[in-house]
Amino acid sequence: MSHADLEKTIEAAWEERAGISTATTGAVREAVDEALNLLDSGQARVAEKAGDSWQVNQWLKKAVLLSFRLNDMVPIEGGPGSSAWWDKVPSKFDNWGEAEFRAAGFRAVPGCFVRRGSYIAPGAVLMPSFINLGAHVGEGTMVDTWVTIGSCAQVGKNCHISGGAGIAGVLEPLQANPVIIEDNCFVGARAEVAEGVIIGEGSVLSMGVYIGASTRIIDRTTGETFYGRVPPYSVVVSGTTPGKPLPDGTPGPGLYCAVIVKRVDAGTRAKTGINELLRT
């Protein structure tokens, strides 16, 4: 079935989703299964770059949501002490052996959990982490320990997502865009990117930076303010904006913001260590 036919079938099923259940068979189930297989293999993505902007394939998000109506809960092996989990989404590695791992070409360290319907490109390294369905992790990217990459989040190639960082997912509301980390980015430990924010190519987020859709992102060199996106090759740290005076005239509390302390070109980014960029 072509992508256009899949989209048509899934869009029609979405409009009639109240009548879809684990008993549903036929074209709808086949279309949803095929859509998830496309996501799992990397042949389709929830978001794709078109020129300088990102296009979201909402029909693929709908396929993911429909799969929860279609699929029943089942035991999933691999729990502690030979126990099992109880869920609707199996592991990406279910029934994999050496041949499948070698063909996939990425490294999966014990303790990582990757749900079926997510794509991991060759050369990626997965430390003990969680990657949700619909997510896309690019070639050569390091996903460090205790990282969460949420549903439909898009992480580019040659990125480093440091320990405990969160790349938030999005399934609902349906119109919400996924978080996108473009190629060659560094996300510091315990940082969090959420609510459809786009981190531009080559950017560096310091440890503990939190960015959501309403977070003020201030370029301290130009004074520009951004919301929802970090420009390419930005070096970003946590900061505060001055508070407004309280009614009695005393200083009010400052508000959190993210600060672009500098911007670097691709050549400088490639030659300069992360710590040096953050400290100069």
Swiss-Prot record:
It catalyses: (S)-2,3,4,5-tetrahydrodipicolinate + succinyl-CoA + H2O = (S)-2-succinylamino-6-oxoheptanedioate + CoA. Pfam families: Hexapep_2, THDPS_N_2. Keywords: Acyltransferase, Amino-acid biosynthesis, Cytoplasm, Diaminopimelate biosynthesis, Lysine biosynthesis, Repeat, Transferase. Its EC number is 2.3.1.117. The keyword Repeat applies. Its main location: cytoplasm. GO terms for molecular function: 2,3,4,5-tetrahydropyridine-2,6-dicarboxylate N-succinyltransferase activity; nucleotidyltransferase activity. It is found in: Cytoplasm. One of its GO terms (cellular component) is cytoplasm. Gene3D superfamilies: Hexapeptide repeat proteins, Tetrahydrodipicolinate-N-succinyltransferase, N-terminal domain. One of its GO terms (biological process) is diaminopimelate biosynthetic process. InterPro entries: DapD_Trfase_Hexpep_rpt_fam, Hexapep, THP_succinylTrfase_dom1, THP_succinylTrfase_N_sf, Trimer_LpxA-like_sf. It comes from the Bacteria. Pathway: Amino-acid biosynthesis; L-lysine biosynthesis via DAP pathway; LL-2,6-diaminopimelate from (S)-tetrahydrodipicolinate (succinylase route): step 1/3. PANTHER family: 2,3,4,5-TETRAHYDROPYRIDINE-2,6-DICARBOXYLATE N-SUCCINYLTRANSFERASE, MOLYBDENUM COFACTOR GUANYLYLTRANSFERASE. Belongs to the transferase hexapeptide repeat family. NCBIfam families: dapD, PRK11830.1. HAMAP family: DapD (MF_00811). This is 2,3,4,5-tetrahydropyridine-2,6-dicarboxylate N-succinyltransferase. It comes from Methylorubrum extorquens (strain PA1).
